[in-house]
Amino acid sequence: MSSLSGKVQTVLGLVEPSKLGRTLTHEHLAMTFDCCYCPPPPCQEAISKEPIVMKNLYWIQKNAYSHKENLQLNQETEAIKEELLYFKANGGGALVENTTTGISRDTQTLKRLAEETGVHIISGAGFYVDATHSSETRAMSVEQLTDVLMNGILHGADGTSIKCGVIGEIGCSWPLTESERKVLQATAHAQAQLGCPVIIHPGRSSRAPFQIIRILQEAGADISKTVMSHLDRTILDKKELLEFAQLGCYSEYDLFGTELLHYQLGPDIDMPDDNKRIRRVRLLVEEGYEDRILVAHDIHTKTRLMKYGGHGYSHILTNVVPKMLLRGITENVLDKILIENPKQWLTFK
């Protein structure tokens, strides 16, 4: 039995699972997102280069990926510290920081935030989507990639002794690339050896989550300790969602607070609003999947922070939970979604 067995590994070390409390399972606290920059049309280039101020906030909120400063979340450490204190004051206990290699993971900043706020922070090992893979990453074998993932959990990430507590978010594109397929196989191999939690970022196709689970299963992964992120923008059809839920992984609705007319990263996708997300969560509960649901905001741009008029990390606790109660999701079920399910997922086998 591993020394990690029965524990959760945070950036400050091992903790008892019961200490976590209400947990957001997919957030970012320090990252850059230049890989998803969308150049604006020529007529909007000037506004895209302006600093974030009240008069252009509406444009940036509607074109989040066309404003380069907006993609530099790593510049807002002090604001994020204040938000984490607010999150804790509103009943929050822990969050999983999903930044991996390719989007500027910074475990030292995560450690400092955990020390200064008292919020349990779990860091992710792994690689983001193919567009961020280095030539070195592409050249690695599955065995070499497995070693990298395991090293992040057993010894430390980013050249530090600060250890990751999950593998992910593992980035997948659509269609899946060969490099991403190798990373998925390595993820399964590392999970099989460590008994660790895994979290996946699927490509923007309803077929992507099914393909990813199949690849993980064939490589020996434990699907019961695997999270499929971003289902709110990936599987929109009810029947297809319930078909996916049968596969046994965690279904994560992690874009709470994101309400867009036009989704730049997937123009064919009509991004649901929070009321639609709540209805999908309620559907999964009604169909018997309350033990397999997780929620979060996936904050990864500046304008989603309270400092810039955004909803912040406390939106689910302060706004979404009351609406869920109003829509018939019970306190007992909400405790499962926010406390028990994250605890079960994050605990090493």
UniProtKB/Swiss-Prot annotation:
Its EC number is 3.1.-.-. Its cofactor is a divalent metal cation. It catalyses: N-acetyltaurine + H2O = taurine + acetate; N-propanoyltaurine + H2O = propanoate + taurine; N-acetyl-L-methionine + H2O = L-methionine + acetate; N-acetyl-L-isoleucine + H2O = L-isoleucine + acetate. It is found in: Cytoplasm, Cytosol. CDD domains: PTE. Keywords: Cytoplasm, Hydrolase, Metal-binding. It comes from the Eukaryota. A divalent metal cation 1 binds at H26, H28, E169, D298. A divalent metal cation 2 binds at E169, H201, H230. GO terms for cellular component: cytosol. InterPro entries: AryldialkylPase_Zn-BS, Metal_Hydrolase, Phosphotriesterase. Binds 2 divalent metal cations per subunit. The keyword Nucleotidyltransferase does not apply. GO terms for molecular function: N-acetyltaurine hydrolase activity; zinc ion binding. Coiled coil: none annotated. One of its GO terms (biological process) is regulation of appetite. Belongs to the metallo-dependent hydrolases superfamily. Phosphotriesterase family. N-acetyltaurine hydrolase that regulates feeding by catalyzing the hydrolysis of N-acetyltaurine into taurine and acetate. N-acetyltaurine has anorexigenic and anti-obesity effects that are dependent on GFRAL receptor and GDF15. PTER also acts on other N-acetyl amino acids (Met, Ile, Leu, Val) and N-propionyltaurine, but at lower rates. This is N-acetyltaurine hydrolase. It comes from Pongo abelii (Sumatran orangutan).
